[in-house]
Amino acid sequence: MATIFRTWSYQYPWVYALVSRLATLNVGGEERFHQLPLENLAISPGQKVLDLCCGGGQATVYLAQSGATVVGLDASPKALGRAKINVPQATYVQGLAEDLPFGEGEFDLVHTSVALHEMTPAQLQSIISGVHRVLKPGGIFALVDLHRPSNWLFWPPLAIFMGLFETETAWQLINTDLGSLLDQAGFTVVRKHLYAGGSLQVIQARANKTVN
């Protein structure tokens, strides 16, 4: 059943949009959802931002509003085609999140929105290491993704959602301590906040590295 609904959500943009709207109601809607990982970040013109796994540009638009130079990366040419229409002021690169085609210390901020739960544990490790590599010293990795609920009332809706639209990797992520993985890769978590009964996590982590 998950395969059918996942296929529909990727094949038909209106299905994906509907699911996104419904899934973000518990944090105040899509706009609020996409702003959560960016709170208290001073993004400004002159900075360079990577929107990792940007999809159709749903979050890219909020990054672009800052006036920063925004690059969106995604593995899907179809998704990138939609992103170019939705957010033409950004530039786009087709590539894999676990094999970032960028140089050392190229970005001030790397952002990703509900993408890490699509990755295997090995891919997740590679992504975190790659993000650390492409960030400038002191650069920020900002993310929002699924989390194991702390309030039992949120288990049924999360389980239904994951059963319909997600795969085993989503279950693996909610049982993974992202903070520890980030720490091991050379980050310091400067902010972590849980929303929707603990079913969503927002993390901002600073890259600890020196200028070469």
Swiss-Prot record:
GO BP terms, alphabetized: methylation
UniProt key word Transferase: yes
EC number(s) on file: 2.1.1.-
SUPFAM superfamilies given in the database record: S-adenosyl-L-methionine-dependent methyltransferases (SSF53335)
Keyword Transferase found: yes
The organism's place on the tree of life at top rank: Bacteria
Keywords for the protein's UniProt record, in alphabetical order: Methyltransferase, Transferase
Pfam families: Methyltransf_25
Recorded GO MF terms: methyltransferase activity
Enzyme class, first EC level, given as a word: transferase
InterPro entries recorded: Methyltransf_25, Methyltransf_Superfamily, SAM-dependent_MTases_sf
Family: Belongs to the methyltransferase superfamily.
Record protein name field: Uncharacterized methyltransferase sll0829
